Amino acid sequence: MDQARDDIWAIEHRHSVRRFTGEAVPADVRAELERAVAAANATSGLHMQLTWDEPEAFKTMLAHYGKFQNACNYLALVGPKGPDLDEPCGYFGEKIVLLAQRLGLNSCWVGGTFSRKRTRCDVGAGEKGGR
């Protein structure tokens, strides 16, 4: 029941943030998020990837238009190509977003205001990014 209560708290307190402090995410927080992504990937068959300290993906005109500032950490939602990819990406991606909120990190879902070519994520043959 504590997990459900924690999730409700995170849902109530979560809001989109586009301006970040630029401070490094603490190692223990990174490790907990990495563990959660690995567990979600094992359960879902996705290939989600966390990238740390990489500002290039958000150095675009669209990111400037979207008012992103100091965005250099991100979760790439990647999985097997197919018509049903968006559902697991949304479900498991939101689980990671809520964990990040509980760990004191704000976030924002991003669709088209970043450069796919500039990301450090690995999209293999037969995979694509979720929307």
Q: Language model features by range: what are they?
A:
Residues 1-131:
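Acidic, surface-exposed loops and disordered segments
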